[in-house]
Amino acid sequence: MTEEKVERVPPIEERTLPKRDLKEQPYRLLVTGSEGFIGKYLVNFLSLDQVYSEFVIDTLDIKNGQDIGDFTRPDIRHDCVIHLAAFADIRNSLDDPERFWENNVEKARGLFKYCEVNNIRLLYASSAGAKEWWLNPYATTKKVNEIMAPHNSVGMRFFNVYQEEFKSRHDMLFKMLEEKTATYLTRHKRDWIHIDDVCRAIARLIPSTITGIVDIGTGQSTSVIELAEAFHQGDLPIKEDTPGEPDELCADISKLNPTGWYPTYDVLSSVRMHPGYEFNPNYAKGNKSNESTELETPQQEGKEEET
């Protein structure tokens, strides 16, 4: 992991948000799904950031009794909406596709319309699975979101987001391996991206002129088996039959390059730096535990480096 003491986001004068007297009228963001895994970290990240701490951040979440399906045009106008409220579970979507369609598609229509009519910048959660949207109902809802979104919005295709120290969602493989509750492995390869890097990417996208679909990952895939081996759990049984799931997912992060963003965490390094990590001599035989797997920092000419 790298920790460089530099600005997380560009200074305000470099932003594309409308310029105005912020004391009279501060910038205003709306974050839906603010109590979810990504949403909670994002709101905290923005509130601590030296630039975004000056913004007014409104939140909306079902856990606070606020259903996105009941969204109506507010009295105040937002400068940007970050829509993270959605069901995200492949297996449950296979069991109840109608419920996922209602929540992820139908309930989002009012919010999308609000942004379109008022020309408000919209960043919404899509999924890496939307590329092969036909594999499961969850991915289908994310693909439909991409189709129905306003033309000047950003569909953020999140890859496998994780956070160490038992802070990921309970149903995420990374946390299951931390807790030693995983019962099987698969042969899948996934692009694991740290929650801090996700928040930094969103912070960069808010003021940018980028639109369309944007992959938010590291650009490197790691197999489930390799990750399990790093956790000393490579001997778990392999499940071959995994309906609805793609074999490999890996982000193309080139569209984020103009923002100066790059990933700063590597999932295998995160495991080795885990408080409960113990050296695995079998894993070291592949020269994987003696060498740093930190991602190389790309040269961003004319761009600031990130923390």
Language-model region placement:
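Adenosine-cofactor binding site in Rossmann-like domains, unifying the SAM/SAH pocket
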Residues: S53-R73
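C-terminal "lid/loop" region of Rossmann-like NAD(P)-dependent oxidoreductases
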Residues: L185-R187, I213-V214, T222-E229, Q233-S254
